[in-house]
């Protein structure tokens, strides 16, 4: 209660200051302010100069930012103002700015946004600063910022009030600046190699391209049920049919699933497709792309994630899913076996399975149970069973498996890719098998998409396709333990609801 009273008192004081400013004819929510410098650009220009060098000639600067600290009494004071690039100290003297501006400076609060004009100089202790000649209040802050040392520590509050998190935690701003640079680097790399960025619908009449529960909505004017897309895949393949031979899309995808450190119901993916390529080509593209991005934005392909040092320099390990399981458990799924025999093996090794699971499902369960989390260095796991890969080509040498790979780094899937299935008869059969699985209770199995099958009947060239989760890639490159750390506004449960996984 006392803390709430204290906050109310602070709010009242700031409201009173606002009223006083307005009574004096000042505008506490000002207009445009022309900056010539930022904290970073000022440091780049003048940090290397000595105190004496800066005094020899005048270096005028104009900056704006949020007041983060303030001190001083009498006729002079210091403050630190913060912009996107960092903080810079300002020095305000009454005899330099005049009585009115100095009174304004003394009245400002931490969190107010100000603009200053002045000259660069260094203090006695060598800190680069601005000797202010003109001081303006640009925005009056009516709420106090969290205390510097005891403030915004609660993780959930940081996610709910990301705007405060960005103000008081510079490393959080750095993460999201880096996220933007990662996307820029990715686009440049693909654009330079002839890929065309496209945009496809986010509302689908039939959800497809992944095994996931969709969000359902309704179009009133058309009186039809629509689904938020669970993948970008099927529309991009239609473009390959149409002759757009190298395409990609970076976009939002929606899956009506649990929230965890690895999952958010709304997330960002890149999907790309290249005609006349296969999954081996896409494997090479994937390692070169990710290594390029790391080198471009971090300056290195050796990164730290948690307790692990990860080497992203190609060429990465490649291992068949069956071989990876055999290495870890000794179980040999190369042997021909029935679905019943596969399920019996699972029970023998305490791998949870359902009675409806086939040989292919069991292989995947073994992999997830015994292998996945142990793949720390970049590893391409290929040869997924047909049963869990309804959109991938069968392997010509062993039709139980597909020409598909997933990329694992630090025990997490980061990419999924195929030699795309372009046989419309086989595709229809795969969809029909998925319908059987839906009838058996798998609500994540694919629906039949007649229009997509029809598009394949016109002929889709051999194609390699790739999907990369942008959020997980950003987590990896920023050493962030939770997906919420790399989403500006992650989905949060209601404050009074129990946590969900």
UniProtKB/Swiss-Prot annotation:
It is found in: Cytoplasm. Belongs to the class-II aminoacyl-tRNA synthetase family. GO terms for cellular component: cytosol. Mg(2+) 2 binds at residue 413. It comes from the Bacteria. It comes from Halalkalibacterium halodurans (strain ATCC BAA-125 / DSM 18197 / FERM 7344 / JCM 9153 / C-125) (Bacillus halodurans). Its EC number is 6.1.1.6. One of its GO terms (molecular function) is transferase activity. This is Lysine--tRNA ligase. It catalyses: tRNA(Lys) + L-lysine + ATP = L-lysyl-tRNA(Lys) + AMP + diphosphate. Its main location: cytoplasm.
């Amino acid at each position: 209660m006392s803390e709430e009273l204290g906050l109310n008192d602070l709010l009242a004081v700031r409201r009173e200051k606002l009223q006083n400013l307005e009574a004096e004819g000042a505008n506490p929510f000002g207009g445009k302010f022309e900056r010539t410098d930022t904290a970073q650009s000022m440091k780049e220009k003048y940090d290397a100069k000595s105190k004496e060098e800066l005094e020899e000639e005048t270096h005028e600067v104009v900056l704006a930012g949020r007041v983060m600290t303030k001190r001083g009494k009498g006729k002079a004071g210091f403050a630190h103002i913060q912009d996107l690039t960092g903080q810079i100290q300002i020095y305000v003297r009454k005899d330099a700015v005049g009585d009115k501006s100095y009174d304004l400076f003394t009245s400002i609060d931490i969190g107010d946004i100000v603009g200053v004009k002045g000259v660069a100089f260094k203090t006695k202790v060598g800190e680069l600063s601005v000797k202010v000649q003109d001081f303006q209040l640009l925005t009056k802050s009516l709420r106090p910022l969290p205390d510097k040392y005891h403030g915004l520590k609660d993780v959930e509050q940081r996610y709910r009030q990301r705007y405060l998190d960005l103000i008081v935690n510079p490393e959080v701003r750095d993460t999201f600046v880096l996220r933007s640079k990662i996307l820029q680097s990715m686009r440049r790399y693909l654009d330079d190699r002839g890929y065309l960025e496209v945009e496809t619908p986010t509302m689908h009449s039939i959800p497809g391209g992944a095994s996931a529960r969709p969000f359902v909505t309704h179009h009133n004017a058309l009186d039809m049920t629509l689904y938020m897309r669970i993948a970008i895949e099927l529309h991009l393949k239609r473009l390959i049919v149409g002759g757009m031979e190298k395409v990609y899309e970076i976009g939002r995808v929606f899956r009506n699933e649990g929230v965890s450190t690895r999952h958010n119901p709304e997330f960002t993916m890149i999907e790309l497709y290249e005609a006349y390529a296969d999954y081996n080509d896409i494997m090479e593209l994937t390692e070169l792309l990710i290594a390029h991005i790391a080198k471009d934005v971090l300056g290195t392909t050796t990164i730290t994630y948690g307790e692990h040092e990860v080497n992203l320099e190609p060429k990465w390990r490649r291992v068949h899913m069956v071989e990876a399981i055999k290495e870890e458990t000794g179980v040999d799924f190369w042997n021909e076996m029935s679905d019943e025999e596969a399920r019996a093996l699972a029970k023998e090794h305490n791998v949870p399975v359902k009675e409806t699971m086939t040989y292919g499902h069991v292989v995947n369960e073994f992999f997830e149970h015994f292998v996945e989390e142990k793949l720390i260095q970049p590893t391409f796991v290929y040869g997924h069973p047909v049963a869990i890969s309804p959109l991938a080509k069968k392997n010509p040498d062993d039709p139980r498996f597909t020409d598909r790979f997933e990329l694992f780094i630090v025990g997490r899937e980061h990419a999924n890719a195929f030699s795309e299935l372009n046989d419309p008869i086989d595709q229809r059969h795969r969809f029909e098998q998925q319908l059987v699985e839906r009838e058996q209770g798998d609500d994540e199995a694919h629906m039949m998409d007649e229009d997509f099958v029809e598009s394949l009947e016109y002929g889709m060239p051999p194609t390699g396709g790739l999907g990369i989760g942008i959020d997980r890639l950003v987590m990896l490159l920023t050493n962030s333990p939770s997906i919420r750390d790399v989403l500006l506004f992650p989905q949060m449960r209601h404050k009074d609801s129990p946590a969900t996984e």
